[in-house]
Amino acid sequence: MSYAIIETGGKQLKVQPGRFYDIELLHVDPETSHTIDKVLLVSHDNEVTVGQPFVEGATVEGTILRHFRGRKVIVYKMRPKKKTRKKRGHRQEITRFMVNAINFNGQVIGATENGTTTPTTANVEVATTEGSDSEE
């Protein structure tokens, strides 16, 4: 199992190829590829490479799936005995990022098997049973 720890949006995140992650807003158009070069750690076949602070020559390639807003967080401030109340809401802008491959020193150490980022659906035949119409 190959994985990497990246830094994006001021947070550190463990990523694996073939999975999507919700990260801070990246100002990139949806359905385009994006490369993250702030890789802190790379693990492949029980070999761990730790950067100081970043791993040289390591990148994480992925696709921006969509942008959306997170759940609303309510901030309520009240001063007792002063009749002062403030109610504010905040919704964080989020980007859904699909990890396609982890590159280390020019070679791909982790990638999706089929190379596609959109899930495929299987064709399923629906069997219908014909019943007799009985009138009562």
From Swiss-Prot:
Disulfide bonds: none annotated. One of its GO terms (cellular component) is cytoplasm. GO terms for molecular function: rRNA binding; structural constituent of ribosome. InterPro entries: bL21-like, bL21-like_sf, Ribosomal_bL21, Ribosomal_bL21_CS. Transmembrane segments: none annotated. It comes from the Bacteria. GO terms for biological process: translation. Keywords: Ribonucleoprotein, Ribosomal protein, RNA-binding, rRNA-binding. The keyword rRNA-binding applies. Pfam families: Ribosomal_L21p (PF00829). Part of the 50S ribosomal subunit. Contacts protein L20. NCBIfam families: L21 (TIGR00061). Belongs to the bacterial ribosomal protein bL21 family. This protein binds to 23S rRNA in the presence of protein L20. This is Large ribosomal subunit protein bL21. It comes from Gloeothece citriformis (strain PCC 7424) (Cyanothece sp. (strain PCC 7424)). The gene is rplU.
